[in-house]
């Protein structure tokens, strides 16, 4: 009888750990996948080189669920948001940092802004 109780507790623990860990792993994996899709798109389709990119980070949002924030070295005060789903990768927004706004950066000054047409 005692063995069945112990087995049940171990099984319950495994299930609970799985419920917590699996979503975390899936989220991190998707962020990594999206980051790589955007990086590949920028380098292979848009002609950037790795050195042009200051940072690239996969994010979890609401809509779109996963997106990527890219900062280019020639515009460190602007964050560009990219969507990457299946084979579709496109820039859907940008954000000028507080520092960039203090410097007076406006949309017409953006060097890497490429809205989807």
Predicted regions and their residues:
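Acidic/proline-rich low-complexity IDRs
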Residues: 11-15, 41, 109
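Short, non-transmembrane alpha-helical segments in secretory-pathway proteins
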Residues: 24-53
């Amino acid at each position: 009888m005692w063995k069945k109780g112990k087995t049940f507790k171990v099984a319950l623990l495994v299930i609970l750990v799985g419920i917590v860990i699996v979503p975390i792993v899936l989220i991190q994996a998707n962020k990594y996948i999206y980051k790589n899709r955007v990086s590949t798109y920028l380098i292979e389709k848009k002609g950037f080189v790795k050195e042009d990119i200051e940072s690239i980070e996969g994010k979890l949002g609401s809509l779109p669920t996963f997106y990527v924030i890219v900062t280019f070295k020639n515009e460190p005060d602007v964050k560009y948001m990219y969507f990457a789903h299946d084979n579709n990768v496109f820039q859907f927004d940008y954000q000028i940092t507080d520092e960039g706004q203090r410097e007076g950066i406006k949309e017409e000054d953006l060097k890497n802004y490429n809205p989807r047409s």
